[in-house]
Amino acid sequence: MIVSFRPTADLVDSIGVDVRSCDLQFRQFGGCSEFAGPISTVRCFQDNALLKSVLSQTSAGGVLVVDGAGSLHTALVGDVIAELAHSNGWAGLIVNGAVRDAAALRGIDIGIKALGTNPRKSTKIGTGERHVEVNLGGVTFVPGEVVYSDDDGIVVV
């Protein structure tokens, strides 16, 4: 499902006090600063094999929300995984953790938000969970709901 982008500030103004706006401050890394789409989720800790497996599947503009437990010890996404996501039709990634290859990520036409960077690779064992509710910054990200992200923040509707 392709979702038309709407600025998060406009969504907040139209929804009002019931808005689900993420309080966690993410940094922009991808080449696309505005993105929106249906939510898919992964929960993994310092292991990106499951994340890569999910992004290997085609998506019609989905956004993968990755709960990496806020770890900045290893990167969950780098240029290879970001290119894979872009080539398979994903609109964006929201990573509660670290990324790497920051300069290269800016050149990939996909939205990527993360907490920070670390050049250290993650493990590739495949541990984690998929299709689970993920709680970040006071917001519950539910698979199938729609997330909007831009320079002002992240809103779930």
Swiss-Prot record:
Report keywords, A-Z: Lyase, Metal-binding
Could you name the domain of life of the organism this protein comes from?
A: Bacteria
Does the keyword field hold Metal-binding?
yes
Write down the chemical reaction(s) this protein catalyses: 4-hydroxy-4-methyl-2-oxoglutarate = 2 pyruvate; oxaloacetate + H(+) = pyruvate + CO2
SUPFAM superfamilies tied to this protein = RraA-like
Q: Which cofactor does it need?
A: a divalent metal cation
Q: Does the keyword Metal-binding apply?
A: yes
- Where on this chain does a divalent metal cation bind? D101
Cofactor binding: number and manner: Divalent metal cation.
Q: Which GO terms describe its biological process?
A: regulation of RNA metabolic process
Question: EC number(s) on record?
Answer: 4.1.3.17, 4.1.1.112
Q: Which CDD domains match?
A: RraA_family (cd16841)
Q: What residues bind substrate, as annotated? A: G78, D79, V80, I81, R100
Single GO MF descriptor: metal ion binding
Subunit info? Homotrimer.
* Family assignment from sequence similarity: Belongs to the class II aldolase/RraA-like family.
**Its job:** Catalyzes the aldol cleavage of 4-hydroxy-4-methyl-2-oxoglutarate (HMG) into 2 molecules of pyruvate. Also contains a secondary oxaloacetate (OAA) decarboxylase activity due to the common pyruvate enolate transition state formed following C-C bond cleavage in the retro-aldol and decarboxylation reactions.
* Stated name of the protein: Putative 4-hydroxy-4-methyl-2-oxoglutarate aldolase
